C-alpha cells in the first residue's frame, strides 16, 4: 500500500512535492404493476464515525465510478474501522485510511486507475484519493481538502492530478476540528496528530440525510 507524501512548509513547495510523489450495475427486478424498478443511488452517502465526531460524505458515482466503487469496497468490508487520520496539515488537507493507531500500515486491495479528468475539483471539503507519484497507485487512503487546492486538479504537473470522488455534506465542523489538532513527527512520518484521530466505523447510509 502506498501513501501520498506531504512534505513540510513552505505551502506551495509542499503541494508541488505532493504532485511529484494520490460501477455499480442496475438491479434487475421482475415486472410488477406495483413495484418500480430499482435504480442504484447515483450519490451514495457514507458516514465516517470518528473519535472527534461524525462526517457524512456524498460520493459522485457518475463522475468517479472506479474510485467510488473502490472506496465502498473498503467501507463495506470494515477496512477503515480503527484506522486514523495519520497526516493533518491545516490549510491543506487531512489524510487517512491506511494506518492504525500504532502507525502500522494495512494491506490493501490492488491500486485503481486515476479518474482526475472528471471535472471535479479539489476544493474545501471535497474528498479525493491519495496516491504516490504514480498516477494509478491509489488504494485505500483518501484525503479531505481543507483549502482550495487547485494545484491538485487535473492535469496537475504530472498530466493527471488527484481524483476527487465526493464531498463532505455534514460534519464540516468535525473536519475543522481535526485540521486544527496538534501534530508532530512520528518516526519517518510527519504531521501526525499527537492524539490519534480514529475512524471508529465507516458505514453506507440506506438513504440520504434529511438535511444536507
Report the location of each language-model feature.
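Cyclophilin-like peptidyl-prolyl cis-trans isomerases
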Residues: 2-19, 23-212
Amino acid at each position: 500500500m502506498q501513501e501520498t507524501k506531504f512534505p513540510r512548509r513552505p505551502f506551495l513547495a509542499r503541494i508541488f512535492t505532493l504532485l511529484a510523489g494520490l460501477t455499480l450495475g442496475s438491479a434487475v427486478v421482475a415486472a410488477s404493476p406495483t413495484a418500480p424498478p430499482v435504480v442504484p443511488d447515483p450519490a451514495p452517502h457514507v458516514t465516517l464515525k470518528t473519535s472527534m465526531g461524525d462526517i457524512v460524505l456524498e460520493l459522485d458515482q457518475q463522475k468517479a465510478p472506479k474510485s467510488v466503487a473502490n472506496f465502498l469496497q473498503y467501507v463495506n468490508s470494515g477496512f477503515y474501522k480503527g484506522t486514523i487520520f495519520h497526516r493533518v496539515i491545516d490549510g491543506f488537507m487531512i489524510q487517512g485510511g491506511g494506518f492504525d493507531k500504532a502507525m502500522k500500515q494495512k494491506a490493501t486491495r490492488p491500486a485503481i486507475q486515476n479518474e482526475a479528468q472528471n471535472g471535479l475539483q479539489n476544493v474545501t471539503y471535497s474528498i479525493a484519493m491519495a496516491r504516490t507519484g504514480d498516477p494509478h497507485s491509489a488504494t485505500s487512503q483518501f484525503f479531505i481538502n481543507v483549502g482550495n487546492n487547485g494545484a491538485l486538479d487535473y492535469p496537475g504537473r504530472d498530466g493527471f492530478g488527484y481524483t476527487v470522488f465526493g464531498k463532505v455534506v455534514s460534519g464540516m465542523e468535525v473536519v475543522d476540528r481535526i485540521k486544527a489538532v496538534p501534530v508532530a513527527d512520528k518516526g519517518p512520518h510527519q504531521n501526525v496528530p499527537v492524539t490519534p484521530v480514529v475512524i471508529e466505523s465507516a458505514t453506507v447510509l440506506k438513504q440520504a440525510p434529511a438535511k444536507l
